[in-house]
Regions:
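Class I S-adenosyl-L-methionine
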Residues: 2-117, 121
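Beta-strand/loop-alpha-helix module characteristic of Rossmann-like adenine-cofactor folds
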Residues: 8-19, 118, 125-295
Length: 295
């Protein structure tokens, strides 16, 4: 209680607090973040970019006070959040680090334009955690990407282009996995399983390969914007190495070094992501070897 009063003195009477929740358990949040959330008059949990375990959310609520869930529309159209923030202190709780997603950077900028004070309390994010956890050099990661669910006949191949470009430059890739089959961000989330991710990879690969073959049949074949895509597609997809990272930063954390072909046989966890290694050094090879089945 004394800590909460101390934090309250440091905070504005009104405004918006972007509070990083870390990776999935109360004890993983910073003391500063917990105190700020407890000191707020209203607490909103942003539940569409990532999710916490329900039991940990219950523990957090016991610790800091009542929490209300909000989804994509409430964050992207923040009129209600701003209305509250004009006369009270509002904490928006975000899994990981609150500025990891541009959605929340945009919210921060819009609050500033509206004359609403906005404070940020950072947290551990999947980007900062997973690179070292799997045993790869953080300096050798390229742009990250997200595997999305297919919508009808539409399949996004942009993640494959990111993978190919990073691979061509000798850089590893972190691929986050979608948790919303509808793409609306309004609820009914179903985080991608390893099997879903493998199927998404195959759909992307098929579409990109068909496009490559069509280009080669043209009288004057056109070079792709990504010079590494065609060479990347020459690989055997099923043998492409991948590291499955499940429930990172929690007591259920697991890491498995496998291949795309064997990925669907893995159970994974509540939330999963993938790391695609590119060229690896000796220490990186040893680091990855720990996670192979039977190691």
């Amino acid at each position: 209680m004394a800590a909460e009063k101390s934090q309250k003195k440091k905070l504005p009477d009104t405004g918006l607090l972007l509070v990083g929740m870390g990776m999935g358990h109360v004890n993983g949040m910073t003391v500063e973040a917990l105190e700020a959330a407890a000191a707020a008059d209203h607490r909103r949990y942003e539940a569409y970019t990532a999710l916490w375990p329900e039991e940990e959310l219950a523990l957090l609520e016991q610790r800091i006070g009542a929490i209300e869930r909000v989804m994509r529309p409430e964050v992207e159209e923040p009129a209600e959040l701003f209305r509250l923030a004009e006369t009270s202190l509002v904490a928006l709780l975000v899994v990981g680090d609150p500025l990891q997603a541009t959605t929340h950077v945009d919210l921060q900028l819009r609050a500033r334009s509206a004359g609403i004070e906005c404070r940020v309390f950072h947290g551990v994010s999947i980007t900062s955690l997973v690179t070292g956890a799997v045993g790869l050099s953080n300096y050798k990661f390229g742009r990250q990407t997200t595997f999305t669910y297919p919508y009808g006949t539409w399949v996004a191949t942009s993640p494959l282009e990111v993978l190919a470009n990073n691979w061509g430059h000798g850089l590893h890739t972190l691929a986050l996995l979608d948790l919303d089959p509808t793409g609306q961000g309004t609820g009914n989330q179903r985080p991608m399983t390893p099997k879903d991710a493998a199927e998404a990879m195959r759909l992307m690969w098929t579409k990109a390969t068909e496009a490559m073959e069509e280009r080669r049949l043209e009288p004057a074949p056109q070079q792709t914007m990504n010079p590494f895509l065609d060479p990347y597609l020459e690989q055997d997809l099923e043998g492409v190495p991948v590291v499955l990272c499940a429930d990172m930063g929690t007591s259920e954390q697991s890491i498995v070094a496998t291949t795309v072909g064997a990925l669907e046989s893995e159970m994974g966890g509540r939330l999963n992501c993938l790391v695609f290694p590119a060229s690896t050094g000796e220490i990186e090879e040893q680091g990855l070897a720990r996670w192979k089945r039977g190691a």
